[in-house]
Amino acid sequence: MDENKKRALSAALSQIEKQFGKGSVMRMGDRVIEAVEVIPTGSLMLDIALGIGGLPKGRVVEIYGPESSGKTTLTLQAIAQCQKNGGTAAFIDAEHALDPIYAAKLGVNVDDLLLSQPDTGEQALEIADMLVRSGSVDIVVVDSVAALTPKAEIEGEMGDQLPGLQARLMSQALRKLTGNIKRSNTLVVFINQLRMKIGVMMPGQSPEVTTGGNALKFYASVRLDIRRIGAIKKGDEIIGNQTKIKVVKNKLAPPFKQVVTEILYGEGISREGELIDMGVEAKLVDKAGAWYSYGDERIGQGKDNARTYLRDNPQVATRLEAELREKFQPAEAPREAGDDEDKE
């Protein structure tokens, strides 16, 4: 750059700093690029698929899927992990359907959980914004976007047609929220539902669409599609769901990774089941017929017995998890991801 341009740039930068404050514009090389802070999801498989070890703080995350697919379970497990690490969590229950007994079973400290059950969508998003701006909450979950009913709709008649009202509400709220989320380093998770598009579809195009317009798709740094793909049985009794989670969008690591995990009724995501499946894949756990072995020790005949063994011997499970993290999770992934994101 020639001297005249340098002087002009220097004058412009000093004018900007004078008008808008120090640090309002800076060279990327002047600050240290730090690793992205994350909150673990409670699923080792998903943490690894996300490429950064969990859900990123200071970002918007969307989790969507059909009914009873495990959306709320996944967010409650993330809340439990956040609380275990000393963080503060808030749950904005627009659906008015949170079960505190189930949340406690998943490891959530219900006494410390901040809960709001707002009357309108505007109230829900205003509460979320105030919690984010406080800078003292680590994770805010909004359950769900579909239940964020605009005030005009609540005050109107049952059959009133108010097209695009919810989409406008979400678009306005996200414009306001994103800057505050980044500044306070809060993770905001929106749970969303699926609807079917009515009308003629193009071949190969999905008829499914998420509620609340397109704004959330753009503002979200991570989007997760979660679906039930089968049942887990113990004899004739169904004890849980086999669940597929796909990383549909990821601004911090390569997207489109997918994992198949198990959600057990009353327990949530089966940590021990994941350790066994990943251990077999990584050849750390040996599977001979129905028997599973880890090291020199047989840990059970059949997956259910192996799962019980790991639950009863937490030191073995912890050792296996440490080996799997070392094998699957590159140590420098978060730093590179943060670096790439900031260069965009």
From Swiss-Prot:
A Gene Ontology term for the protein's cellular component = cytosol
What does the UniProt entry say about where the protein is found?
Cytoplasm
Predominant localisation class: cytoplasm
The UniProt annotation places ATP binding at 65-72
GO function terms (MF aspect): ATP binding; ATP hydrolysis activity; ATP-dependent DNA damage sensor activity; damaged DNA binding; single-stranded DNA binding
**Disordered: region residues:** 323-344
What's an example Gene Ontology biological process for this entry?
A: SOS response
Q: Which SMART domains is this protein grouped with?
A: AAA
Q: Which Pfam family is an annotated match for this chain, by its short name?
A: RecA
UniProt KW keywords? ATP-binding, Cytoplasm, DNA damage, DNA recombination, DNA repair, DNA-binding, Nucleotide-binding, SOS response
Could you confirm whether the keyword DNA repair appears in this record?
Answer: yes
Which residue intervals are annotated with compositional bias (Basic and acidic residues) in the record? 323-337
**Which PANTHER family does the record associate with it?**
MITOCHONDRIAL DNA REPAIR PROTEIN RECA HOMOLOG-RELATED, RECA
What does this protein do, in the record's words?
A: Can catalyze the hydrolysis of ATP in the presence of single-stranded DNA, the ATP-dependent uptake of single-stranded DNA by duplex DNA, and the ATP-dependent hybridization of homologous single-stranded DNAs. It interacts with LexA causing its activation and leading to its autocatalytic cleavage.
For this chain, the family text in UniProt reads: Belongs to the RecA family.
Output the HAMAP family linked to this UniProt entry: RecA
- In its UniProt entry, what is this protein called? Protein RecA
Q: What is the lineage of its organism?
A: Bacteria, Pseudomonadati, Pseudomonadota, Gammaproteobacteria, Lysobacterales
